[in-house]
Amino acid sequence: MTDTHLITTIDTAWDNRDSVSTDTTGEVRDAVETAINLLDSGKARVASRGDDGHWVVHQWLKKAVLLGFRLNPMDLIEGGIAGAKWWDKVPSKFEGWGEAEFKAAGFRAVPPCAVRRGAFIAPGAVLMPSYVNLGAYVGEGTMIDTWASVGSCAQVGANCHISAGTGIGGVLEPLQADPVIIEDNCFIGARSEVVEGVIVREGSVLAMGVYITRSTKIVDRASGEISYGEVPAYSVVVPGALPDPKGGPSLYCAVIVKRVDAQTRAKTSINDLLR
């Protein structure tokens, strides 16, 4: 099946998704499984960055992820600690894996991390007890720390640290047009949340407890400029509040307090010994 035919088949199936079910066979099922396998292997990504820095979302791959839920029946999911099982429509990425497969993949998977099939984990990445949903991409050398979650179709670049308890939002529910994107060399502080298709540009540092949605005001303290939906490259961001000019309650915002410098890098650098 050529790329063009694959995309057309999935787009057509999406337009007629009410007729897609666990009984569907043939070309539609083959196309969706092919797309999921491309995502799982890293040969395709839900979003890709152009030379101009603009991110392009490949909607057909996101559609394939969603169609998979209509095609796949509930089934036992093996692989839990002490023989634990789950009941779901998406198998574990590690289903059927042995020593050879883990060595070939080249990343660390610390128990009891969970990764659904259709997510790609690059060589050198470290998964602490965390969760990575299908369609997600985790770049080379990145650590997903304890109890952090990487949502469906989210894109996390290389050499990032996604700290403990952090949530990187997905696209499935509520249904989102664009995935969250964390570019290379970013540090996301513990218990932070980045959702609703927000882009965190390269080298940025989010302090502990920063929450950013599409509607969150991002305030540059130096200029007073307010923006939405994107953290500029090499920003240091902390939680803040904007006063109500009428004297009412202050409202939460994210504040760019400075640009990343040597001192920031010293505090947030990744540890090669752990990789």
Curated annotation (Swiss-Prot):
Residues that bind substrate? 108, 145
Q: Which PANTHER family does the UniProt entry name for this protein?
A: 2,3,4,5-TETRAHYDROPYRIDINE-2,6-DICARBOXYLATE N-ACETYLTRANSFERASE, ACETYLTRANSFERASE
Q: Which reaction does it catalyse?
A: (S)-2,3,4,5-tetrahydrodipicolinate + succinyl-CoA + H2O = (S)-2-succinylamino-6-oxoheptanedioate + CoA
| Stored Pfam families | Hexapep (PF00132), Hexapep_2 (PF14602), THDPS_N_2 (PF14805)
The EC designation for this entry is 2.3.1.117
What organism is listed for this UniProt entry? Maricaulis maris (strain MCS10)
Pathway assignment reads: Amino-acid biosynthesis; L-lysine biosynthesis via DAP pathway; LL-2,6-diaminopimelate from (S)-tetrahydrodipicolinate (succinylase route): step 1/3
Please report the name of this protein according to its UniProt entry: 2,3,4,5-tetrahydropyridine-2,6-dicarboxylate N-succinyltransferase
What does the UniProt entry say about where the protein is found?
Answer: Cytoplasm
The GO molecular function terms of this record are: 2,3,4,5-tetrahydropyridine-2,6-dicarboxylate N-succinyltransferase activity
Its BP terms in the Gene Ontology are:
diaminopimelate biosynthetic process; lysine biosynthetic process via diaminopimelate
Q: What class of enzyme is it?
A: transferase
Q: Which family does it belong to?
A: Belongs to the transferase hexapeptide repeat family.
A single GO CC term for this protein reads: cytoplasm
Q: Which UniProt keywords apply?
A: Acyltransferase, Amino-acid biosynthesis, Cytoplasm, Diaminopimelate biosynthesis, Lysine biosynthesis, Repeat, Transferase
Against InterPro entries, the record matches this protein to:
DapD_Trfase_Hexpep_rpt_fam, Hexapep, THP_succinylTrfase_dom1, THP_succinylTrfase_N_sf, Trans_hexapeptide_repeat, Trimer_LpxA-like_sf
Q: How does it assemble?
A: Homotrimer.
